[in-house]
Amino acid sequence: MTERLDVPVAGGTLAVFRLAEGGEPVLAVHGITANSHAWLAVARSLEGRAVLLAPDLRGRGASSRLPPPYGMEAYTSDMLAVLDHCGIERGVLVGHSLGAYAVARFAADHPERVRTAVLIDGGLARPLPEDVDPEQFLAAFLGPALARLELTFEAPEAYHEWWRAHPAMAGSDVSPDDLVAYANHDLVGKAGALRSGVAREAVRADAGELLELGKPAHRLSVPVEMLRAPRGLQNDPTPMIPAELANAWAGDAPHDRRVGEVPDTNHYTIVMGASGARVVAQAIVRALQSPVEDPRLRSPR
């Protein structure tokens, strides 16, 4: 079951989707050009043990018309509004990609509202070598995602086919029905000129923060589990979060931080594929079963 909630936020209403039934609510935050329907496989894998509250971040999906500002401060304010609207005093938060950075920022700024966090293939930033230009790095890193926002399609089926052929999706265990639902939730416009509804301004604003986004994860004072994919955005062998980076971060607070690799996944299939979604669902269940501690008794690292 998918139910839409409209949550009042600055500038209008944020669309939040309640995915599945039964169990405790968990706030699930998607990636930079994604939408709430990226969580369909995870919601199904939870099998009634939790309900995902999946917002479309402002500038995406059914929240695409929400105005600026964009960026981490705006997203964390919207997340706080969702928790308040749903009566969640202290919740489990899970984020993928950009959503992992948003969850880390929220948990660092509002530890009293977070029971446990789950960060999926995001949350940390690799330091750039001195000889690498930051602007060129960002252009190369986000290039394929940004290029998609400029494409137009004659019909929804053409967009579905584009996604099926995507290197991260081709031959994967992503459900065809989930992929269609995810793509349809992104489409806007009229037949003959359909396109992604992601606001270009939002992506540009987020890109401007990318090199700083990894800092909040280092000051977390709540328990957190990080799951990483061994393959990248294009199913390439360069992961979003290298193992050595994740392990070093976890080593700074070994009692509070846990890191795991989800085998045979890439940046997309770690949440959208059947096998990745099962592992993510298990991490969410572990988070829900963790003891509730008073964050005021814990010290930031």
Regions found by a protein language model. Name each.
Residues M1-T13:
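N-terminal cap/lid segment of alpha/beta-hydrolase-fold proteins
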Residues A15-R65:
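Conserved HGGG/HGGXW glycine-rich cap/lid loop of the alpha/beta-hydrolase fold
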Residues F17, L53-V94, V271:
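Active-site loop/oxyanion-hole signature of alpha/beta-hydrolase fold enzymes
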Residues E89-V132:
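Conserved hydrolase catalytic core segment
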Residues I120-E154:
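A catalytic-pocket lid/entrance helix-loop region that shapes and gates access to the active site
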Residues E150-A207:
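Conserved alpha/beta-hydrolase catalytic His-Asp/Glu region
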Residues L187-D252, E261:
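Conserved serine/cysteine hydrolase catalytic core
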Residues V262-S275:
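Catalytic histidine-centered segment of alpha/beta-hydrolase-like enzymes
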